[in-house]
Amino acid sequence: MDKTTIIVVDDSPFASKQIKDLVEENGYEVIGYAKSGEEGIKMYEELHLDIVILDIIMPGIDGIETAEILEKSDPDVTILMLSSLCDTGTLEEVRAIGVKYLIPKPWEDDVLLATLELLKKHKEENKKEDNN
């Protein structure tokens, strides 16, 4: 089976490297980083990969607006959001745009990996349904 491909959209190079190291040790492939929402949108449109790991707080357009743009351009996009803002209002805002998973920063490695596994399985199930 092909590796699940991921881009990390986070303005923190340190966080991006931590995520890359963790997920690649566990069978995923990080094929790019973006430091802003604008870069992340462009990268996704060029590569159409499996999962976008997206921070909320970034310069320029934030993660919520980035997710809205990605969802409008590709309703099948799979997004995992990370943020130090995990209050009820933020969670409701994230869900309203169709993102199902928001993990608090700093994240627990096992939670991040378990969530990626759920997203991967969900994406595989959708592909099977589309092929039937």
What do these predicted regions represent?
Residues P13-G32:
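Two-component/phosphorelay signaling modules centered on CheY-like receiver
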Residues S36-E39, D62-E65:
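Acidic catalytic/metal-coordinating carboxylates
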Residues L47-I53:
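Active-site beta3 strand of CheY-like receiver
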Residues M58:
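Receiver (REC) domain active-site loop signature in two-component systems and cognate sites
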Residues E65, C86-I103:
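Alpha4 helix (beta4-alpha4-beta5 surface) of REC/receiver domains from two-component response regulators
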Residues E117-N132:
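The C-terminal output helix
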